[in-house]
């Protein structure tokens, strides 16, 4: 099973402030919507609760709480390992989509990073882990918006 990771990261490494993303760069979320369309997303409970279930996506939500969901497109797991073990029986690709603890736990296990770097330095309390030296950028595109950003694809190896 291929594991990809998608994140929007500010210049100072912030990815969240409590349950919120501390910016709104017009157009950047369209990248997320396009890349994750019809895909399985692996997320933590807090991230899932802040983003909600987007249409045409399936979710594996990892939580230590008693969180449940009646949505047929949402599966809940008590650990990342249990989620991955189940997902590999039903799909060949999963996109790790946050939050901070999930990113930190899986960044060394993913094959591809989809990173939007947002040209802002907000306050926040959730940070993206350092990108391992085993990754190399293979694509980059800059976008001019209300808050400028760049989108990069990084591959392991």
From Swiss-Prot:
Assembly with partners or alone: Homodimer.
Function: Key enzyme in folate metabolism. Catalyzes an essential reaction for de novo glycine and purine synthesis, and for DNA precursor synthesis.
Record has Secreted as a keyword: no
Sequence ranges assigned to domain DHFR in this UniProt record: 2-156
Chain segments annotated as transmembrane: none
Pathway annotation: Cofactor biosynthesis; tetrahydrofolate biosynthesis; 5,6,7,8-tetrahydrofolate from 7,8-dihydrofolate: step 1/1
Species classification: Bacteria, Pseudomonadati, Pseudomonadota, Gammaproteobacteria, Enterobacterales
Name this protein carries in UniProt: Dihydrofolate reductase type 15
InterPro entries per UniProt: DHFR, DHFR-like_dom_sf, DHFR_CS, DHFR_dom
The entry's keywords: Antibiotic resistance, Methotrexate resistance, NADP, One-carbon metabolism, Oxidoreductase, Trimethoprim resistance
Organism: Escherichia coli
EC numbers for this chain: 1.5.1.3
Gene Ontology biological process: dihydrofolate metabolic process; folic acid metabolic process; one-carbon metabolic process; response to antibiotic; response to methotrexate; tetrahydrofolate biosynthetic process
């Amino acid at each position: 099973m291929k594991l990809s990771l998608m994140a929007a990261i500010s210049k100072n490494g912030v990815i969240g402030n409590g349950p919120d993303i501390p910016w709104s760069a017009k157009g950047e979320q369209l990248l997320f919507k396009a890349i994750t369309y019809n895909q399985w997303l692996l997320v933590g409970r807090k991230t899932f609760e802040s983003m909600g279930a987007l249409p045409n996506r399936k979710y594996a939500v990892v939580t230590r709480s008693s969180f449940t969901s009646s949505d047929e497109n949402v599966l809940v797991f008590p650990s990342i390992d249990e989620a991955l073990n189940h997902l590999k029986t039903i799909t060949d690709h999963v996109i790790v989509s946050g939050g901070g603890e999930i990113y930190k736990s899986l960044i060394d296990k993913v094959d591809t990073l989809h990173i939007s770097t947002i040209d802002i330095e907000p306050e926040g309390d959730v940070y993206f882990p350092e990108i391992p030296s085993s990754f190399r950028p293979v694509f980059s595109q800059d976008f001019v918006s209300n808050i400028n950003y760049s989108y990069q694809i990084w591959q392991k190896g």
